[in-house]
UniProtKB/Swiss-Prot annotation:
Induction summary: Negatively regulated by the transcriptional repressor NanR. Induced by N-acetylneuraminate, via inactivation of NanR.
The organism of origin for this protein: Escherichia coli (strain K12)
GO terms for cellular component: plasma membrane
Protein known as: Sialic acid transporter NanX
Coarse class of the protein's main subcellular location: membrane
Keywords associated with the record: Cell inner membrane, Cell membrane, Membrane, Transmembrane, Transmembrane helix, Transport
Sequence intervals crossing the membrane: 21-41, 54-74, 81-101, 103-123, 140-160, 165-185, 215-235, 251-271, 283-303, 308-328, 345-365, 372-392
Gene null: resulting phenotype: Inactivation of the gene in NanR-deficient cells prevents the growth on 2,7-AN and 2,3-EN. Deletion of the gene in strain BW25113 results in loss of growth on 2,7-AN but not on Neu5Ac.
Compartments it resides in: Cell inner membrane
Membrane topology field: Multi-pass membrane protein
Length: 405
C-alpha cells in the first residue's frame, strides 16, 4: 500500500514550506491592497484613470530588477536569508505608501514594493520546491502560491471598509506587519538542503541566463510567463474599478473579489494535485481551456446579477489563475540549482511585465469598446497564445535542443 503523500514530508520540510507560504500571504496582502482602494486614491490625489492604472502596475517595472538581484543573491548566499530581506523590503515599501502626497511619491513606493515582492517570489519559490520530495513538488509549488490568494482574500475583506473609515493612508501602514515574520523565519526556518549540497560547486554569473546553453530556454520561459500574466492580471487589477464604475457598492465588490480569491486559492491547490498526477504541462492546458467557459459570459452579465458574476468569477479564477500555482515547479524543471534563483527571479519577473502591459492595453482598448469588452479581448488573446505554447510543449522541445548542443 502506497504511503500517503503528506506522510512523505518531514517536519523541517513542512516548516520550510510554511515560512515561505506565510511570506507569500503577506506578499499578496501588501501587493493587492492598492487595487481595492485605487478609486479612493484616484479621487484624493486627483489623478486620471490611465495614471491610476499605471500606479497600480508600476510595481511590475521593478520586478525584473528585484527578482534578478535577490535571485542571484539567493544562489550565492542562500534562499532563507535573501527571502527575509525581500519580505522586509516589500513591507517597508507598503508602509511608505501611506505617506505619499502625490502621484510620483506613490509610484516610487510601489516600485519599492515591486523590488521586494519579486525578490520574495524568487527566493520563496526555489526554497519551497527544493525543500520537498521530487514527486511532491507540484504540490509544494501550489501550496506556496496559494498563500498569495489568502493574502488577497484578507485584503479584499479588510482594506476597502478600513480605508473608508480610517483613510487609504492608514491602510498601507497595516502592510508593515510582515516585518515581524522575518524574525520568526530567522529563528525557526531551515535552509534549503538542495542549495546547501550545491553551494560549493561553480556558480553562474548574473548574465548566465542570457548565454548558451541557457539563453533559448530563458527566452521561451519568459514568453510563457509574459502570456500567463497577460491572461490573468487585467481582471485581477481592473475588475474592482470596472464594478465600481458600473455602480456596484464597496461591500458587493469586496464580496465578489473574495469569491474570486477563493476560486484562485482552491484552484491553485487543485492544480497542484493535478500537476503531480498528469504533469504540469497538461494541467496548464486543461485549466486554460476550461477557463473560457467562465470568461465568455462574465462581462456580458448585468452587474446587478451579482450571484452569477460571483459564480463566473470563482470558476475563472479557479482555472485561469489556479494554474499559476504550478509556475514555480514549471521553472524549477528548466534551471539547475546554481542558476535557479536567478532564473526564477529574473526571467519570471521579466515575464511579469505582461501584468503591467496587459491592463494598460485593456484600459486603452476600453476607450473604444468599454472596459468589460476590452478585458475580455485581452484575456482571451493571451490565454490562447499560452495554450499554443504549452500545449505543443514548445519550452520542452527548446530545452531538449539546448541540452543536446
Amino acid at each position: 500500500m502506497a504511503t500517503a503523500w503528506y506522510k512523505q514530508v518531514n517536519p523541517p520540510q513542512r516548516k520550510a514550506l510554511f515560512s515561505a507560504w506565510l511570506g507569500y500571504v503577506f506578499d499578496g496582502f501588501d501587493f493587492m491592497m492598492i487595487f481595492y482602494i485605487l478609486h479612493i486614491i484616484k479621487a484624493d490625489l486627483g489623478i486620471t484613470d490611465i495614471q491610476a492604472t499605471l500606479i497600480g502596475t508600476v510595481a511590475f517595472i521593478a520586478r525584473p530588477i528585484g527578482g534578478g538581484f535577490f535571485g542571484a543573491m539567493a544562489d550565492k548566499y542562500g534562499r532563507k536569508p535573501m527571502m527575509m530581506w525581500a519580505i522586509f523590503i516589500y513591507s517597508v515599501g507598503t508602509g511608505l505608501s501611506g505617506i505619499a502626497t502625490n502621484l510620483y511619491m506613490l509610484a516610487v513606493c510601489r516600485f519599492i514594493v515591486g523590488l521586494g515582492m519579486s525578490g520574495e517570489y524568487a527566493c520563496a519559490s526555489t526554497y519551497a520546491v527544493e525543500s520537498w520530495p521530487k514527486n511532491l513538488q507540484s504540490k509544494a509549488s501550489a501550496f506556496l502560491v496559494s498563500g498569495f490568494s489568502v493574502g488577497n482574500i484578507i485584503a479584499a475583506q479588510i482594506i476597502p471598509q478600513f480605508a473608508e473609515v480610517y483613510g487609504w493612508r492608514n491602510s498601507f501602514f497595516i502592510g508593515l506587519l510582515p516585518v515581524l515574520l522575518v524574525l520568526w523565519i530567522r529563528k525557526s526556518a531551515p535552509e534549503s538542503q538542495e542549495w546547501i549540497e550545491d553551494k560549493y560547486k561553480d556558480k553562474s554569473t548574473f548574465l548566465s541566463v542570457f548565454r548558451k546553453p541557457h539563453l533559448s530556454i530563458s527566452m521561451i520561459v519568459f514568453l510563457v510567463c509574459f502570456c500567463l500574466f497577460g491572461a490573468n492580471w487585467p481582471i485581477n487589477g481592473l475588475l474592482p474599478s470596472y464594478l465600481a464604475d458600473n455602480g456596484v457598492n464597496t461591500v458587493v465588490i469586496s464580496t465578489l473579489m473574495t469569491i474570486a480569491g477563493l476560486g484562485t486559492l482552491t484552484g491553485t491547490i487543485f492544480f497542484g494535485f493535478v500537476g503531480d498526477k498528469i504533469g504540469v504541462k497538461k494541467a496548464f492546458v486543461v485549466g486554460l481551456i476550461t477557463s473560457f467557459i467562465f470568461l465568455c459570459p462574465l462581462f456580458f452579465i448585468s452587474v446587478k446579477n451579482s450571484s452569477l458574476i460571483g459564480l463566473c468569477l470563482f470558476g475563472l479564477m479557479f482555472t485561469n489563475l489556479g494554474i499559476a500555482g504550478l509556475v514555480p515547479k514549471f521553472i524549477y524543471d528548466y534551471f539547475p540549482t546554481k542558476l535557479r534563483g536567478l532564473g526564477t527571479g529574473l526571467i519570471y519577473n521579466l515575464g511579469a511585465t505582461g501584468g503591467m502591459a496587459a491592463p494598460v492595453l485593456a484600459t486603452y482598448i476600453s476607450g473604444y469598446y468599454g472596459l468589460g469588452v476590452s478585458l475580455f479581448i485581452v484575456t482571451v488573446a493571451f490565454s490562447a497564445l499560452l495554450i499554443l505554447l504549452v500545449g505543443f510543449d514548445i519550452p520542452g522541445k527548446i530545452y531538449k535542443l539546448s541540452v543536446a548542443k
